[in-house]
């Protein structure tokens, strides 16, 4: 299949495996959930009754005082420990490489099918000016959208001029992830990025 290059009459032949496969919602959902879970720090911690600082002496006599109680560090008391206290743990989920790559291909294919994928010859700016970068984006007619720009190489000027725009994310092919792709309204790829993506996924 061929993708039209924006601002040119030329087309770019691309692999059907990457940009023309069927969309698998279940697979993409699985990969996105796994990616987000793996990013969790998992540092939540609470103190159980054995970890709370306090005496373990019986708080009152056994008989004649209502309900029977022992130490005041029990979970039912204010300042006591937490029942079933949370401990630091890893939320990471194993994802097979083949599954991950299939999901990325599925996302690219669906973006292409919905007309949310644009290809440009190159995307670079000569000066570190947000105004210059914004004008370049305006020519793509995607103003007001959450925009992801994927380039085969990111220059310092491109990085500096884009970082002040809240709805624009500029990444290299190596920094791509499923959450960024799914969360973008429009994805802009340079010709060089398309070739690198095909090398990675095919």
Swiss-Prot record:
Annotated segments matching region Disordered: 42-70
CC terms in the record's Gene Ontology section: ribonucleoprotein complex; ribosome
Gene Ontology MF terms in the entry: rRNA binding; structural constituent of ribosome
UniProt cross-references to SUPFAM superfamilies, sorted A to Z: Ribosomal protein L4 (SSF52166)
Keywords, ordered alphabetically: Ribonucleoprotein, Ribosomal protein, RNA-binding, rRNA-binding
Taxonomic superkingdom: Bacteria
UniProt feature, compositional bias: Polar residues: 42-52
GO biological process assignments: translation
Subunit structure, interactors included: Part of the 50S ribosomal subunit.
Protein family (similarity comment): Belongs to the universal ribosomal protein uL4 family.
Function: One of the primary rRNA binding proteins, this protein initially binds near the 5'-end of the 23S rRNA. It is important during the early stages of 50S assembly. It makes multiple contacts with different domains of the 23S rRNA in the assembled 50S subunit and ribosome. Forms part of the polypeptide exit tunnel.
Protein name, as recorded: Large ribosomal subunit protein uL4
């Amino acid at each position: 299949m061929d993708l039209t290059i924006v601002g040119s009459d030329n087309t770019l032949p691309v692999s059907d495996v990457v940009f023309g496969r069927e969309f698998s919602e279940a697979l993409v959902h699985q990969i996105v959930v796994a990616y987000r879970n793996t990013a969790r720090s998992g540092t939540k911690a609470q103190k159980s009754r054995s970890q709370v600082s306090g005496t373990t002496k019986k708080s009152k006599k056994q008989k004649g005082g209502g309900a029977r109680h022992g130490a005041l560090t029990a979970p039912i008391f204010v300042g006591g420990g937490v029942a079933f206290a949370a401990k630091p743990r890893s939320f990471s989920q194993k994802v097979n490489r083949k599954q991950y790559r299939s999901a990325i291909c599925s996302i690219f294919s669906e973006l292409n099918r919905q007309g949310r994928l644009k290809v440009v010859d190159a995307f670079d700016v000569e000066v570190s000016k947000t105004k210059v970068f914004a004008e370049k984006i305006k020519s793509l007619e995607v103003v007001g959208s959450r925009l992801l720009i994927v380039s085969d190489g990111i220059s310092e000027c491109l990085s500096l001029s884009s970082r002040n725009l809240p709805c624009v994310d500029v990444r290299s092919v190596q920094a791509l992830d499923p959450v960024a792709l799914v969360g973008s309204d429009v994805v802009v790829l340079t010709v060089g990025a398309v070739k690198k993506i095909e090398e990675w996924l095919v």
